A protein has these predicted regions:
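Phosphate/NTP-binding elements of NTP-utilizing enzymes
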Residues: 2-151
Length: 151
């Protein structure tokens, strides 16, 4: 098992690690691909200051936001502060990265530290996906430095 982990991180599998998909895994994978809200509710984990690593329980407005992202290419959101927008966006970016081929995702913010925080949240959510859902390429990031994933 130690041979199948990436850079000593037991939450990440190495590239080209063979994973046996059960029929249940395939059904779940297809459900998640078609429904980003289902994916977020069932597979995305976030860090809570009070409880540590917890499942991401979306509020109804967050579900609507994710569905809007999924169904519309362009979105404008006029929303107040501290409503979980960043976490919601991270959950959708993770879905988008896993279930779409040949894509690039940029995380921009008014300060580099904020962009790095969002990238860190994305990394935590990815690391806590089941191994059968992790999509690994040969070029896996070694570390995050100055707003970039370094390979």
């Amino acid at each position: 098992m130690v041979d199948n982990v990436y850079l000593g991180n037991p939450n990440l599998k190495k590239a080209n690690t063979k994973i046996e998909f059960s029929e249940e895994n395939i059904i779940e994978f297809l459900k998640c691909k078609d429904d980003p809200v289902y994916f977020a509710k069932n597979y995305v984990k976030i860090v809570s200051l009070d409880e540590g690593l917890v499942p991401f329980n979306l509020y109804p407005f967050q579900e609507k936001l994710v569905n809007n992202f999924h169904n519309n290419r362009f979105n404008i959101c006029k929303m107040p502060r501290q409503t979980g927008k960043s976490t919601t966006v991270v959950s959708y970016l993770l879905h988008y990265a896993i279930f779409n081929d040949s894509i690039n995702i940029g995380i921009l913010a008014n300060k580099a530290k904020i962009a790095m925080d969002l990238l860190g949240r994305l990394q935590v959510a990815y690391e806590n996906l089941p191994k059968w859902m992790q999509q690994m390429s040969r070029r896996q990031p070694k570390k995050v430095r100055q707003n970039r994933l370094e390979y």
